[in-house]
């Protein structure tokens, strides 16, 4: 690919990165898609679709494939990073030497930093410096529906108001099929995407056990309370968690089997082991690592998160899923409102 002036460079050619690239390109924006595996990029270029994840969605003509990172980053000042959270920092450090002087970074990665549990904004600042504008996309988005052009809405938060406006009114203005809501709460929009992964595993476990819709709904509601408590402790606006990046994403991933986290939880509830369930999914289950990271973050903040604690016990301490659920049901009585 010769150097071009693109509206956006997308880093990460998995299902979600490809779906976002298709969505932007379909709506008239020039988009460059880069992936870490040159052979994969060559295959995508040959097939003009992502056979592995989105085989029924052809690439628009304005979606360009690039295997050379330097050329991909030279094509646009705006860079959308869509990679798993446990490699987020490594990828940003890989990008830094090749970024344009006027570069701006937005990510659609959901989660916290592996091992440390830090918000991704802190990882980005450490990797890229204090001056580069940053933004985050988060909300209820399944890759297959997004790529198919089905109506989707998402939240956008940025460190720079002009950057947020440029994205919302510019390359992320995609007609009626993809609606972007701006939100000034940079912390809350990031956090919602991490905590919902954990609660989705719990919802799947509940359904795998066979506890039914009542239990699932109670778990979602109390999971939202945990999300809000942790967010408030970190300085987020609690109202953010009633929006796309909170309740919206939480309901989606807890109730639909397109969610890898939910399917993973269902298998655990049915008695499968953690490794067996992960192998069956065949893709990254973000909630597995997120559970450890979210719990550690909550403990540092002194925030009680009993659902997250029990999911951690199942994932890392070999506790039976049914026993974990019964532990939650057996907790001391509490008033609902003060704990929210």
Curated annotation (Swiss-Prot):
Among InterPro entries, the record links this protein to: 6-PGluconate_DH-like_C_sf (IPR008927), 6PGD_dom2 (IPR013328), G3P_DH_NAD-dep (IPR006168), G3P_DH_NAD-dep_C (IPR006109), G3P_DH_NAD-dep_N (IPR011128), NAD(P)-bd_dom_sf (IPR036291)
PANTHER family cross-referenced by the UniProt entry: GLYCEROL-3-PHOSPHATE DEHYDROGENASE, GLYCEROL-3-PHOSPHATE DEHYDROGENASE [NAD(+)] 2, CHLOROPLASTIC
Family listed? Belongs to the NAD-dependent glycerol-3-phosphate dehydrogenase family.
Q: Which GO terms describe its molecular function?
A: glycerol-3-phosphate dehydrogenase [NAD(P)+] activity; NAD binding
What job does this protein perform?
Answer: Catalyzes the reduction of the glycolytic intermediate dihydroxyacetone phosphate (DHAP) to sn-glycerol 3-phosphate (G3P), the key precursor for phospholipid synthesis.
Pathways involved: Membrane lipid metabolism; glycerophospholipid metabolism
Query: Which species does the entry assign this protein to?
Result: Serratia marcescens
Q: Does the keyword Disulfide bond apply?
A: no
A GO BP annotation = carbohydrate metabolic process
Location of the protein in the cell? Cytoplasm
Protein name as catalogued: Glycerol-3-phosphate dehydrogenase [NAD(P)+]
Residues that bind sn-glycerol 3-phosphate: 110, 139, 141, 196, 249, 259-261
The protein's predominant localisation is: cytoplasm
**What is one term from the GO cellular component aspect held by the record?**
cytosol
Cite the active-site annotation: 196
Which Pfam family is an annotated match for this chain, by its short name? Answer: NAD_Gly3P_dh_C
Asked whether the keyword rRNA-binding is assigned, the reply is: no
